[in-house]
Amino acid sequence: MDAQSYLKRIVYRGSVRPSIDVLRRLHVRHLLSVPFENLDIHLGRPIILDQELFYNKIVRDRRGGYCYELNGCFAWLLRELGFRVSMLSARVAGKNGGFSPDFDHMTLLVRLEEPWLVDVGFGDSFTEPKLLDSTRPQLDSGELYRIARKNRETVLSRWDEIGVWAPLYSFTLRPRKLEDFKARNRYQQTSPKSHFTKRRLISKLTPNGRVTLTDRKIILTNGEQRSESPVRNSKQFDGLLTKYFHLSFE
């Protein structure tokens, strides 16, 4: 495992001395370079919680992954560069107003002069680290985010188009180890109730928007413009996978 190869993978150049400016740039470059994807689950390849395996997949094979892989690997890079990083357990907000079980999502806490929420593994979410500050909303790529304490947890929310704070996930600040996520990682890739087993998904931030591909459709956003087109068969899916993500499994 080599930090310089990782930096090359995310096309990062410049200082790596721990600071909020460097953290912001690393975060954005990671999102622009490494997709969120669950393709291994549908290829019958088990996802094992091991940082060297994450590194090989993301850096050497130029793939992506889901939260445990992406944030687990990014945590390794940040520590190699001298950042103080903790893995946190998060519970994803559901449509019914509740939250999923513990360890359903992994997010990161980076401590500089102030504590920052870092997450390169939650798909379409914030692009820059968020200050753990419950007193004011934080603007990010035209979206407002808020981090607020609720009982014993902290909740990340986004200002919705209907004019309410919509929770994304809740988390505690207790540091966790990679193996703590083992049971939930197994569930995510094997349970028929897991949304990761229901369909293939790959999504990546672009300089002006996002590209998202599933078994059923491809969605392209560019600024205020959004287009959605059906995916009719596996051959078309494979072609789009190569065109937009430079991946092929032939």
Task: Give the location of each predicted region.
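Cysteine-centered nucleophilic/redox motifs
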Residues: 63-89, 108, 202
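Short glycine-/small-residue-rich flexible loop motifs, especially phosphate/cofactor-binding loops
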Residues: 4, 75, 238-239
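Residues at alpha-helix termini
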Residues: 9, 80, 243-244
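His-Asp-centered catalytic microenvironments across diverse enzyme cores
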Residues: 1-10, 14, 34-35, 91-98, ...
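Short active-site-adjacent helix-start/loop capping segments
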Residues: 44-47, 76, 95-96
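Secondary-structure boundary elements
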Residues: 1-62
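Generic C-terminus detector
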Residues: 229-250
